[in-house]
Amino acid sequence: MAPTVDIKNLIYPWLIEAEEYSFNDINDGIRLHLNESPFPPPDFIIEEVKKYLHLGNRYQHPSLLERLRELMAEYNRVEPKNIYPTPGGDGALRAVFYNLIQTGDKVVINNPSYSMYKVYASVRGLKLTRVNLIENDNWWKMNFEKFLDEAKNARLVIIDDPNNPTGSPMLKAEEDKVRALAESINGFILIDEAYYEFSGYTVAKLINKYPNLLIVRTLSKAFSLASYRVGYLIGNEEVIKNLMKGATPFDISLPGYIAGITALENPSYVRKIVEEITKNREYLLNGLRKLGLKVYNSLTNFVFVKDERDLLSPLLNKGVAIRKPIIGYYRISVGTKEQVDTLLKYLGEIIENGNSK
């Protein structure tokens, strides 16, 4: 007879208590809840990927990794040795959480911020400190002095810039603030620039000046490659070299490599996507404000709305998904002009009919 084992006793308590990433999804309808691009990848990427689908029985050749690093470095005006390609931006976050910090270490983030920071911290058994953002008219801003004070005994600080879910700039690549953090912390500074293509600012030029500075990037948003799972870390050569030792073999799929390489060889299409989404974002902002909703300015592909009513459920019933990251606030991804019009129409009906009470 097999010995009786309470399996929970074999699992670390912090993993049992860890939080999960959760959201409401829809199979059909208008998806404005995951900050995806509403535009599919251009045909030239799809056609290039198709050429390699018959090689599904083979692992990826190392030359693909080398080429992707070269292109990512060129795109960011750094060296390939400063680039670590990962399966999406979340792969970059995982690399940091699982290799540069250990159970019991302190991590400091803004509140609110990207929800996966909290998930990774709880799964790893880390001490998480959250510093509340400050509402500033139609924007949100960091409480930088408090954040800096908390950073002094932290192993890792993470700043998503622009911030998710508020869409507001945080450090805005101001070197004085980066320097202050770099000099205060006995650990790493991780700047999550997932929305760099929309904000236009970056701290990439500072990685050699501040060797404990790391940057997360993704091709999921402006490049329209979310399901291909291509992201990367930018950092000091020594940090990147050692992080890559922990990479699993072939962790980016062959279609991901081909899509990423083809996109970065032809990046001009991204500018058109960013321009269209930016135009639609301003259209969405104005439309929401005309409905009487409190909505904040944004430097991303989403907007942040303050409202105590239940807007989530009635919109889901109409086939439109948005996100409610915290109580009393909604995050709405920017869609096509047609999707924005549909959303505004439904929201107007919901508010007028009082179904959101």
UniProtKB/Swiss-Prot annotation:
GO terms for biological process: L-histidine biosynthetic process. It catalyses: L-histidinol phosphate + 2-oxoglutarate = 3-(imidazol-4-yl)-2-oxopropyl phosphate + L-glutamate. Pathway: Amino-acid biosynthesis; L-histidine biosynthesis; L-histidine from 5-phospho-alpha-D-ribose 1-diphosphate: step 7/9. SUPFAM superfamilies: PLP-dependent transferases. Its cofactor is pyridoxal 5'-phosphate. Pfam families: Aminotran_1_2. Keywords: Amino-acid biosynthesis, Aminotransferase, Histidine biosynthesis, Pyridoxal phosphate, Transferase. Its EC number is 2.6.1.9. It comes from the Archaea. One of its GO terms (molecular function) is histidinol-phosphate transaminase activity. PANTHER family: HISTIDINOL-PHOSPHATE AMINOTRANSFERASE, HISTIDINOL-PHOSPHATE AMINOTRANSFERASE-RELATED. NCBIfam families: hisC. This is Histidinol-phosphate aminotransferase. It comes from Sulfurisphaera tokodaii (strain DSM 16993 / JCM 10545 / NBRC 100140 / 7). The gene is hisC.
